[in-house]
Regions:
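Conserved alpha/beta-hydrolase
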Residues: 61-79
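Short alpha-helix in the alpha/beta-hydrolase fold that links the catalytic acid
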Residues: 56, 205, 219-228, 239
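Active-site nucleophile loop of the alpha/beta-hydrolase fold
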Residues: 134-144
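Active-site nucleophile elbow and catalytic-triad environment of alpha/beta-hydrolase enzymes
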Residues: 28, 182-199
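Catalytic active-site module of serine/aspartate enzymes centered on a nucleophile-bearing elbow/loop
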Residues: 241-269
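Short beta-strand/loop motif that positions the catalytic acidic residue
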Residues: 203, 209-211, 215
Length: 269
C-alpha cells in the first residue's frame, strides 16, 4: 500500500459552523450520586464526556453504589480547548475525584472506557488500596490505521485535527463528544500510554477487561499488553462479538453490565 492510499482526511481549520459536539443535548458534566459505602469512579474516554459512562453509572447506583464521574479538562467544550490541555491535567482531575470519593466510601473501584481505562491504571499505580479496576476497550495501544494517520500529520504545523469516521455510529448512541480527534490530544495519549506501560508492574489489583471485536480505534492486543505487565492475581478478559469501540454503550450493553456486576460482586464479597 502506498502513502497516497492511506492519506487521511485532515482539518487545518478550527472554525466550523457546526456544533463541536455530537449529541450536545446530553448531560456531560461531572456528577456524584450518593449511595452506600462502596464507591465507583468512572472515567470517560478521549474527546468524550461523562455521558459516555452515565448508563453504566446508573446501573451501579441502582445496585446501591456511590458513583462519581468527572469531566476531563478540555472536554465538553471545543476541540481547540482540548488541544491546550495535557495528560498531567487529566490525571490531576482524576486524582481529585478519587480522593473525594474515597473520603465518603470504605471501598472504591475505578473503571474507565478507552483513555479512561488508562487513567484508571494510573490511579491504581498510585493507590494500592483501590479494590479493583474495570477497563472497557482500554486504549493501551491505538489501532495501526489510526497510528498511521497520527504519525503522518503530527509534524505539520498546519493540521489541527483528524475527522472521525465513526460519527454515524455514535450519533445513534447516547454518546457525546467531539467530531474530530485533535492531534495534540492524540500525542498526549501516546505519551500517557508510554508512561503507564512503564508502571504496569506496580499494579496488583483485580482487573476486568472487556473489549469489542469490532473495535477499530484501539489495538485489539491492548488487553493482552496490560495483562502481560501487571502483577494482578485476579484477572478476567471478555469479548463482545457485535460491539465497536464504545463497548459500554453498544448493542451488547446488557452483557457488559452482567459481566461487570458478576465480577464486582465476586471481588467485594
Amino acid at each position: 500500500m502506498n502513502r497516497s492510499q492511506i492519506k487521511p482526511e485532515l482539518s487545518n481549520s478550527s472554525i466550523s459552523a457546526e456544533p463541536p459536539l455530537v449529541n450536545p443535548e446530553l448531560e456531560g458534566g461531572d456528577f456524584f450520586w450518593q449511595g452506600g459505602a462502596d464507591g465507583v469512579l468512572l472515567l470517560h474516554g478521549l474527546t468524550a464526556t461523562t455521558a459516555e459512562v452515565r448508563p453504566l453509572a446508573k446501573r451501579f447506583h441502582d445496585e446501591g453504589f456511590t458513583v462519581s464521574a468527572v469531566l476531563l479538562p478540555g472536554h465538553g467544550t471545543t476541540p481547540e480547548k482540548l488541544s491546550h490541555t495535557n495528560r498531567r491535567e487529566w490525571i490531576a482531575v482524576c486524582e481529585k475525584a478519587y480522593a473525594e470519593l474515597q473520603k465518603k466510601c470504605s471501598r472504591v473501584i475505578v473503571g474507565g472506557e478507552s483513555t479512561g481505562g488508562i487513567l484508571a491504571l494510573h490511579l491504581a499505580t498510585e493507590h494500592p488500596e483501590i479494590k479493583a479496576l474495570l477497563l472497557y476497550a482500554p486504549a493501551m495501544r491505538l489501532a495501526s490505521s489510526l497510528l498511521r494517520k497520527l504519525f503522518m500529520v503530527v509534524a505539520s504545523p498546519f493540521v489541527f485535527a483528524v475527522p472521525k469516521k465513526t460519527e454515524e455510529d455514535r450519533d445513534a448512541m447516547p454518546w457525546q463528544g467531539y467530531k474530530v480527534n485533535p492531534l495534540k490530544a492524540g500525542v498526549q495519549l501516546l505519551k500517557l500510554q508510554a508512561d503507564i506501560k512503564k508502571r504496569l508492574a506496580r499494579i496488583y489489583q483485580p482487573i476486568l477487561i472487556i473489549q469489542a471485536n469490532l473495535d477499530e480505534t484501539v489495538d485489539l492486543n491492548s488487553g493482552e499488553i496490560i495483562f502481560r505487565g501487571v502483577q494482578s492475581a485476579v484477572r478476567e478478559s471478555h469479548w463482545m462479538e457485535k460491539s465497536r469501540h464504545v463497548v459500554i454503550l453498544d448493542q451488547e450493553f446488557e452483557e457488559v453490565i452482567s459481566t461487570t456486576m458478576k465480577f464486582v460482586k465476586k471481588i467485594l464479597q
